[in-house]
């Protein structure tokens, strides 16, 4: 059964030494598709280059809340144009991150709203990054009627109760390596509650590698460890988890379930 890594950062310098060899090997080993996600202006450019080079890699274009300090109208015009790239399947990752004091919340909120408007205009799903900002994220999304746009809550980290707000908006939940951590009680409670039909699997590579590789560089094939834990929680097989989350990823990003002949 093929793996769909719905959120990775293979443009990261952690892959500079072996990127081509690794990506080709992952594809041979059953990773059918990867969405490489932009976070800054420079990473969006690299993401488009990767998607252009590898048929099984798709792009998401957007500016991470922690990088919104670099945005102005000129650079945002470039983002708007880049989101029209034929292999861009989503606007992201966008959202709010209050873990660090900069950029200030007002700046993050402004560009989050602008990027949500862009997703609506282009009819593309959103990849939402939210950290230590649960209430403001939901409030802004509801104000913008984000449920009409759709998308995924990347690396979901909030409570089971908060999950209900996103379920009501019809959003998917990105689940990755953290699910395998022994201390991830809150996420495990949420993942048990969220229907499998609303879950997609992701790595956030090179970050957040699952057990038994915690602390190492994350790679797409490690998703199988996450699938094993999720299967155990749901009382089904790994194959069922991979099949359903593959279909969910295709629905999320508007891709056909069957691989195109160029992707094989």
Cite the ranges covered by each PLM segment.
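Mid-domain alpha/beta scaffold segments of enzyme catalytic cores
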Residues: 1-264
